[in-house]
């Protein structure tokens, strides 16, 4: 059973459609890269999956034990967010807020997991530092550790390497790849088609041309100079 299924989605703002009749599914262990032109609706799609936007038409369902509230999310940062005056530890552990319910504190286990996620992202030595004092790459690792606190199943990453230099970009991709190897499903928006084809198992291209399928099928379409259209949510490979 698919972890995530999008059926006949139409998305937009103020009555203006930007994505029409889009269908695809994501299985446990997939690494899906969402690519496409600027303004094609990639971030809107991701926010709709998270329940932050409502589709104009169609539906999104989760399965295989996944709940919408158990999806980890790394958003694009605004300038205000980059200047947020909180400690690294405070930001990372805030990833558990969706699981706290009405209790006003974090459990001992949540504190332990937050520390483990900081170690995994190699930022445990920064946990007392102020977030806004960190480099761009360090901030992205903090946000990835925070997203891990929200999930053990699926990560949604909105351009996680935007603005990073080549060395830090490579490190970030390596960390994400390792999380995928450990069993976490990854859905990532990217403008870097080369990296998408290196790391992803599946590609979703949205825009003037729409494609959903395996990266191998996508490569064949690229060589032919065209993309195959997705129909009815069929998984190509």
What is the meaning of each model-derived region?
Residues 50:
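Helix-to-loop junction immediately C-terminal to a conserved catalytic motif
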Residues 130-134, 138:
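Conserved ABC ATPase signature
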Residues 155-158:
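Catalytic Walker B motif of ABC-type/P-loop ATPase nucleotide-binding domains
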Residues 108-126:
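Conserved ABC ATPase "signature" region
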Residues 58-69:
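Conserved ABC transporter NBD signature motif
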Residues 190-191:
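H-loop/switch region of ABC-family ATPase nucleotide-binding domains
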Residues 203-216:
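H-loop (His-switch) and adjacent beta-strand-loop-beta switch element
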């Amino acid at each position: 059973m698919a972890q995530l299924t999008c059926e006949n989605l139409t998305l937009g703002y103020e009555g203006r459609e930007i994505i029409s009749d889009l269908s695809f599914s994501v299985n446990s262990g997939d690494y899906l890269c969402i690519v496409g032109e600027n303004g094609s609706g990639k971030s809107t799609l991701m926010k709709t999956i998270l329940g932050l936007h409502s589709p104009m038409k169609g539906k999104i369902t989760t399965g295989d034990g996944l709940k919408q509230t158990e999806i980890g999310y790394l958003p694009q940062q605004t300038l205000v967010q980059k200047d947020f005056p909180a400690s690294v530890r405070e930001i990372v552990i805030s990833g558990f807020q969706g699981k706290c319910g009405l209790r006003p504190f974090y459990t001992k286990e949540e504190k332990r997991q937050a520390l483990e996620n900081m170690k995994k992202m190699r930022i445990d030595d920064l946990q007392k530092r102020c977030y806004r004092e960190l480099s761009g790459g360090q901030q992205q690792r903090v946000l990835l550790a925070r997203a891990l606190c929200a999930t053990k199943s699926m990560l949604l990453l909105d351009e996680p390497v935007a603005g990073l230099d080549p060395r830090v970009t490579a490190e970030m991709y390596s960390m994400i790849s390792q999380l995928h190897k450990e069993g976490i499903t990854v859905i990532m928006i990217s403008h870097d088609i080369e990296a998408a084809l290196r790391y992803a198992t599946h590609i979703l291209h949205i825009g003037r041309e729409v494609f959903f399928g395996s990266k191998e099928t996508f490569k064949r379409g690229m060589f032919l100079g065209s993309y195959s259209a997705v129909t009815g949510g069929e998984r190509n490979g």
